[in-house]
Amino acid sequence: MAEVAPAPAAAAPAKAPKKKAAAKPKKAGPSVGELIVKAVSASKERSGVSLAALKKSLAAGGYDVEKNNSRVKIAVKSLVTKGTLVQTKGTGASGSFKLNKKAVEAKKPAKKAAAPKAKKVAAKKPAAAKKPKKVAAKKAVAAKKSPKKAKKPATPKKAAKSPKKVKKPAAAAKKAAKSPKKATKAAKPKAAKPKAAKAKKAAPKKK
């Protein structure tokens, strides 16, 4: 049973690429409505273009009218309801059709108005690019303030205090200088011994 279960799981991913491949051709090329508008605009007939003439022009442009006959009719109806086409003869998809000049002229100014908006948006983008300059200026100000904080360390003061401790050996030297005085005091009694010798020498004179 464990060997049979992985087989459906392997088959499922294989189906997904087929759906993607089928979806790609739909995106390529202009829509049916665009082709119909081009065909009607190309015709010079004052009374309008019939549905049969539209199909011939679409077929000449490489569009498969036989397979997409229903799409052509739906597209014609939708263009009439939108106001892009005006139906001069007949009803529904059958009859003759003309371009609605007012609708076409209204679309052109709308496209021109959309173009300046795009330019304004492009002009606003450089303004957004200027913001990093302000950030850079703030960083520069922060960099200027940081040296002030660097001055706070009191290590040089401690180094200046240390020489005071060095002066203590000088006091020890003074004590050492005082000690020879004591040595001289101790040496004075030695000098008194010759006096005693002189006294002994003077004793024989009494005899």
Swiss-Prot record:
Q: Where is this site: Cleavage?
A: K138, K139
PROSITE patterns from the UniProt entry:
H15
Mark out the compositionally biased spans (Low complexity): 1-15
**As annotated in Swiss-Prot or TrEMBL, what is the tissue specificity of this protein?**
Oncorhyncin II is expressed in skin.
A GO molecular function for this record? structural constituent of chromatin
UniProtKB keywords:
Acetylation, Antibiotic, Antimicrobial, Chromosome, DNA-binding, Nucleus, Secreted
Compartments where found: Nucleus; Chromosome
UniProt temperature dependence: Thermostable up to 80 degrees Celsius.
Annotated GO CC locations = extracellular region; nucleosome; nucleus
- Residues that bear N-acetylalanine: A2
The protein, known as: Histone H1
